[in-house]
Amino acid sequence: MERKQLHIMAIGAHVGDMELTAGGVLAQHAAMGDKITIVNMTPGEKGNPPHLTVEQYAEQKIREAREFAEMLGGQSIVLDYKDGELPDTDEPRFRVADLIREHKPNILITHWKNSMHKDHSTTSRIVVDAQFYAGIKGFERENPAHFAGGPYFAENWEDPYDFKPYTYIDISKGYLLWVEALKKIWFVTNSTSFKYFEYYDALSKIRGCEARKSRAQAFAVDPLSMKQIKESF
């Protein structure tokens, strides 16, 4: 039976978040012929290096997001909220819900809810509610209701509190593409505050060992999704 094409939408707080934490899975699905959309709520511009202004770094990160997505044959959407100032209101929730209705993904990926970074926690709450708003036809918007599966919560060193890996995705076929695409994002290999590439590369190896694969990325799920319903053992 021919496999049905999937559409994966990863929604992060800043350019680089989903590209690092779920990028291997996105590359894996791209290699399988699936459709990829990466949404960033902000560029993540306030971590600007000394040689760039905040405004210049925002422009650079928007370009980096586009180049990363294009390497996967996907699309990038960077919203115009400000880094560190993402509002925890219904306005961004309905904005994301509208994107879900417009692009009709099968699966959502976002941040785990408990983070040291307020934008990450806020994005997680936004996506959970946006999934609900997008799927209920009683919320009348420009496009008809669409329910997307998930969300799956990506593993991020800044979102560690109570994170429990539950779903492991083999990224062996997408690993090299992911590594090449990450070279488009400046801070991944140039940050002096944290060794981003080394951390996430090593983490993919560790999760791969746990999954008995060469490389993997792991995701948490809502506790309600862990229920098993069987007729018998």
Language-model features and meaning:
Residues 1-102, 232:
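Active-site rim/loop-helix segments in enzyme catalytic domains that contact anionic ligands
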Residues 2-11, 87-233:
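Metal-dependent de-N-acetylase/amidase catalytic core
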